[in-house]
Amino acid sequence: MPSSFPEFPSQETIRSEFQAQNDGKEPPVGYHTTETLIRSIDIIVNKRGGFLSNDVMPPFVLMDNIPAWETGALRQARDLSLAMRNDITRSQSQSEEDPNLVQAQVLLNNDSEKWIFPSAEGKYNEAAQRLRDYRAQLVDTDSREGDFYARSDNLAAALELMSKRLGSMSQNLAASVAEERRYTALANDPTSSSAKARPPAEVMKTPWMQVDNVFYQARGTTWAMLSYLKAFEEDFDRVLADKNAHPSMDQIIRELETTQKALYSPMVLNGYEFGLVPNYSLAMSSYMTRANAGLIDIINLLRDG
């Protein structure tokens, strides 16, 4: 599949490199997810051309598509680090957080537009180092520090963060064409209330100059999601097999892979739904919505199945 974006961290490469360094042993549970997160951060920050989100000089300050991609991918890295800190590496709700993951999660939440005192790149590279420290403890069988619990509830917690991100991005993409949206936040609950009054319906439309930014942010989001879902298939293999959820996960991955196809137009086309010119944002939204529906099904299966 042709793509103009960085290659995904390869799970086969991660496994083979670990085996080459450890006399053919299989990686421990959690190694694929941790290593994929580390490599994705390295790609975001140190890819060809570097990290552009915080550049303040031309021509890079005028190149907003790559910074939008970086924003989407970085948000997913933050979400995964949060899931690892709060859920996946803790045996129960009263257990202690892993200090390396605490530091990594905090460092990843530094402002991506800071270019000095401190620079965003410096903080993100430091976060990757904290993850390497956690990884070293994970593979050390003599250490009691650094664990990874591949349970169905932990996987569900990580997938829920992805589902919310997909839902938000899908709505933003759909707004490339003006549409009336009903206010449904308080629907189906007669006792609910909100802090602010809202009109029953609003017309939502992304400004023309921001359509490509939203599109490339979605590309970055799905790029990172694909990397992490493939890692989950390795580390949560027994959980997914027990729920017979591998086919569903494979279908989600197929939907998201479609979002990474190369664009053959020099600009993000933004036609109407059934007009002569295609609408790339609506096409992207369709794939992400289907992937999100699959994620919701797996989450329900993990919670209730």
Question: Where does each model-flagged region fall?
Answer:
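Long, low-complexity intrinsically disordered regions
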Residues: 1-4, 68
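A cross-kingdom marker for long, charged
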Residues: 3, 7-17, 213-216, 222-305
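N-terminal Sec/ER secretory leader and immediately downstream segment
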Residues: 10-123
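Extracytoplasmic/periplasmic, Sec-exported soluble proteins
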Residues: 29, 62-76, 89-96, 100, ...
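Charged/polar positions within long, soluble alpha-helices
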Residues: 46, 50, 79-89, 113, ...
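A cross-kingdom feature marking solvent-exposed beta-strand/loop segments within repeated
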Residues: 54-65, 111, 118, 202-212, ...
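Long, amphipathic, charge-rich alpha-helical segments that form helical bundles/coiled-coils
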Residues: 100-138, 248-273
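Extended amphipathic alpha-helical interaction segments
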Residues: 123-253
